[in-house]
Regions:
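Divalent-cation
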Residues: 1-177
């Protein structure tokens, strides 16, 4: 009886392991789907804000926790939908000047203050919004979208680099990447 119990135990741990692997794979795929789900409303909001020349700064958490930055602004939790994103950055909104922070596929804060990149020759022509995006991208692995008020141009900062004046197609690729 002992041998059979042992073999049964071995079999069940093996089964358990493959089940766990399957569940983890499903969770990863679900996470990816959830991440993809926020891209469409973000894209729509960005296209509208760029067209209306509404300035915006949106930081999307990746691996490194953005909670400390979220707490520099107004903390709340809301689903990512285009109208809400646009309303927050609307000129008369009390939160329009700061950054929006997105984590776990939800908006977790707005009106946040981000660390500003040092002034270098590289970014001497950048405005405060772009320098803040660059600063956060130097300190974290967040993906950051910037929309300029002046020209309604879309830029994207990631890992200390800023891609300026990109198309919405390019933005989508950078968000999905």
């Amino acid at each position: 009886g002992e041998l059979r119990k042992m073999l049964t135990a071995i079999g069940s741990t093996r089964r358990w392991r493959s089940l766990k692997r399957l569940l983890n794979k499903e969770k990863r795929e679900q996470d990816l789907q959830d991440e993809r789900r926020i891209i469409a409303p973000l894209m729509l909001a960005c296209m509208n804000m760029a067209r209306k020349k509404t300035g915006a700064l949106i930081a999307i958490q990746q691996g490194i926790d953005l909670t400390p930055f979220a707490h520099t602004g107004e903390v709340f939790r809301a689903e990512v939908n285009a109208r809400l994103v646009e309303n927050i950055f609307f000129k008369n909104s009390p939160l329009h000047d700061g950054a929006m922070v997105i984590a776990d596929n939800s908006i977790i804060a707005a009106g946040c203050i981000l660390p500003v990149a040092y002034n270098t020759d590289l970014n001497k022509d950048l405005g405060l919004r772009h320098r803040s995006a660059l600063g956060l991208s130097q300190e974290t692995d967040a993906k950051i979208i910037i929309i300029s008020e002046e020209r309604g141009r879309i830029s994207f900062a990631y890992r200390g680099e800023i891609h300026q004046d990109i198309t919405t197609d390019e933005l989508q690729l950078l968000l999905e990447g």
